[in-house]
């Protein structure tokens, strides 16, 4: 069998030499007649869109998991760095972590195996309690060992790639950090009552300021009682416009035009303030008589 395989004959089952193999490789004929067809079929094959989508989803999921793993390792590293920055003692006469005095007058101390610093028993961790001679580690060295164990650095002989979390802006995105909801404060009833009183007072002031002089004069004229010395005067007759005049009877005294300017009405209101009837009415003030047949009476508008 071996002679048949390694013989120099031209049998088709004999392995060709290197020259023939190189020639067949250039001609893409392969080892047998079926080799070229298999290669051709392999080249013509292509993936369907569904298969391509599934492959892309697997790749994207692997990338997301990789990013999550890097963020997890970054949180471990940040915690370790924070502990290293918050040391308060020198590790010789004081505890490395809390800064408590050590010695005869202070707390009892233990010696960390990794960093060779002294810490108190509260800040130290006993790594091997079953041994005759206990092994102590400080919290920083114990956390560093935990980081190497949980990140896989012991396998890679170094810390893998990690992503540190953001400082202050990133705390809001942390699922473990949520700001307390602030309840809206209800308005006090006292403040609402004060605002209502203020609105009422303001409306009264505005409404009093919006009255015109003509309204005041017309109301005062209608409420004024009839003079005792005049008879037959038409006081019940409705007034017209502010510029109109009232006619006097033939047998009674004549009256001047009833329209007055704004200054005269204001002057009359100031002078008539003192001659007010206790019952609420205003008394007329007659003008001095002039020599003649007719007597005129001045009407004061308020």
From Swiss-Prot:
Protein name: Rab effector Noc2
Gene: Rph3al
Residues that, per the record, bind Zn(2+) 2: 112, 115, 138, 141
Function comment: Rab GTPase effector involved in the late steps of regulated exocytosis, both in endocrine and exocrine cells. Regulates the exocytosis of dense-core vesicles in neuroendocrine cells through interaction with RAB27A. Acts as a potential RAB3B effector protein in epithelial cells.
GO annotation, cellular component aspect: presynapse; secretory granule; synapse; transport vesicle membrane
Pfam families: FYVE_2
Protein's UniProt keywords contain Nucleotide-binding: no
Native source organism of the sequence: Rattus norvegicus (Rat)
Phosphoserine modified-residue sites: 248
């Amino acid at each position: 069998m071996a002679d048949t395989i390694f013989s120099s004959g031209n049998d088709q089952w004999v392995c060709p030499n290197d020259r023939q193999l190189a020639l067949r490789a250039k001609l893409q004929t392969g080892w047998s007649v079926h080799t070229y067809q298999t290669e051709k079929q392999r080249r013509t094959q292509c993936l369907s869109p569904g298969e391509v989508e599934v492959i892309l989803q697997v790749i994207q999921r692997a990338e997301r998991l990789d990013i999550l793993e890097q963020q997890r390792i970054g949180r471990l590293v940040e915690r370790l760095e924070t502990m290293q920055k918050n040391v308060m003692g020198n590790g010789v006469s004081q505890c490395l972590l809390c800064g408590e005095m050590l010695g005869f007058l202070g707390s009892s101390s233990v010696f960390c195996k990794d960093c060779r610093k002294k810490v108190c028993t509260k800040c130290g961790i006993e790594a091997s309690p079953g041994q005759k001679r206990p092994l102590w580690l400080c919290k920083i060295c114990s956390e560093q060992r935990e980081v190497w164990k949980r990140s896989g650095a012991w396998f890679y002989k170094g810390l893998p790639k990690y992503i540190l979390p953001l400082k202050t802006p990133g705390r809001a995105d942390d699922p473990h950090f949520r700001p307390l909801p602030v309840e809206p404060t209800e308005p006090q009833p006292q403040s609402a009552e004060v605002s209502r009183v203020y609105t009422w007072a303001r409306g009264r002031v505005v409404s009093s300021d919006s009255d015109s002089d003509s309204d005041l004069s017309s109301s005062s004229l209608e409420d004024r009682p009839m003079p005792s010395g005049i008879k037959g005067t038409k006081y019940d007759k409705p007034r017209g416009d502010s510029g109109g005049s009232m006619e006097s009877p033939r047998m009674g005294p004549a009256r001047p035009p009833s329209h007055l300017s704004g200054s005269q009405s204001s002057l009359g209101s100031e002078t008539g303030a003192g001659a007010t009837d206790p019952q609420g009415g205003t008394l007329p003030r007659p003008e001095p008589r002039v020599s003649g047949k007719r007597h005129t009476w001045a009407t004061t508008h308020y």
